[in-house]
């Protein structure tokens, strides 16, 4: 039975919280990204990027399913991937698109915690159908962008130039790489920015495909977080902010434990290390992009830029 969903946009802290939830709730089945199109490939042959980026193998949780359940789950998962094949990522706009998968997980014998990453638009539907709670985490877009671009090069590729840029990201050259160079490099698309941008266009957005990757990421970041924010009624769903939680983890662990009904063990609070790029020039650049894209009013509603650095 699904008891709790912890969701967030890519590189917002969801994986470290999956690890915390998994270790804090040993009697629960904690499942990582069940909608990931790469799930079964990663389960059988974990990529170097997964192991190095996260420091552990998050997909091995599916080995707790017996062979019959795993086979059935794989069948359902394959059907969903086929349904979303034109988008390249499995992000549902309506629960009906993935309800067979979540019904299956809800019918498992063990109480279950899910970290899906891709449920921004259906959180309230999940909470209503399965009588579960959800928390959606939001991180400032500067560090989300850095997490999707520079950090993989540093942690996985061990690229010396990337390490230098990461170290000096608050300098002129660092800002140039982040805001001018990387947005125009297609190989940066490691976190499905183009694919998610294509899917977001179901909202009848008239943004051109010619936008650079940073613009596209900001559009996706805004829509995913805005719609999740609007579904959080503080009864079954709530929103937390990476910068606040990592600054005062013990306070927020208590709040999230009380709200969710599952445990955020205080002994794991110490493993949260806030990584916040406090740079006014970068904030100004990101705000200018959001204004040009017509997104700033939405962003001001769910995470005003003045709060980005905690």
From Swiss-Prot:
In terms of Gene3D superfamilies, this protein maps to: P-loop containing nucleotide triphosphate hydrolases (3.40.50.300)
InterPro entries linked to this entry? P-loop_NTPase
Q: What is the name of the protein in this document?
A: Uncharacterized protein AF_0600
């Amino acid at each position: 039975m699904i008891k709790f969903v912890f969701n967030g946009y890519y590189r917002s802290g969801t994986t470290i919280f999956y690890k915390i939830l998994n270790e804090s709730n040993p009697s629960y089945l904690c499942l990582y990204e069940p909608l990931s199109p790469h799930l079964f490939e990663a389960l059988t042959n974990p990529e170097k990027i997964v192991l190095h980026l996260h420091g552990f193998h998050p997909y091995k949780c599916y080995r707790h399913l017996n062979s019959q359940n795993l086979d059935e789950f794989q069948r359902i998962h394959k059907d969903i991937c086929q349904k979303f094949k034109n988008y390249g990522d499995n992000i549902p706009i309506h629960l009906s698109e993935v309800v067979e998968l979540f019904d299956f997980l809800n019918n498992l014998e063990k109480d279950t915690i899910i970290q899906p990453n891709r449920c921004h638009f259906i959180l309230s539907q999940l909470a209503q159908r399965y009588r579960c709670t959800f928390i959606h985490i939001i991180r400032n877009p500067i560090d989300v962008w850095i997490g999707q671009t520079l950090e993989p090069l540093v942690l996985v590729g061990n690229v010396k130039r990337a390490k230098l840029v990461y170290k000096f990201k608050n300098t002129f050259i660092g800002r140039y790489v982040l805001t001018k160079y990387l947005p125009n490099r297609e190989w940066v698309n490691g976190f499905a920015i183009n694919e998610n941008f294509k899917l977001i266009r179901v909202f009848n957005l008239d943004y051109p495909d010619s936008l650079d990757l940073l613009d596209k990421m900001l559009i996706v970041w805004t829509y995913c977080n805005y719609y999740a924010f609007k579904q959080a009624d503080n009864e079954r769903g709530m929103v937390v902010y990476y910068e606040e939680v990592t600054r005062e983890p013990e306070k927020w662990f208590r709040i999230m434990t009380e709200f969710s009904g599952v445990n955020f063990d205080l002994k794991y609070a110490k493993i949260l290390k806030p990584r916040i790029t406090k740079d006014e020039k970068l904030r100004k650049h990101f705000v200018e992009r959001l204004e040009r894209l017509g997104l700033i009013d939405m962003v001001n509603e769910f995470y005003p830029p003045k709060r980005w650095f905690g």
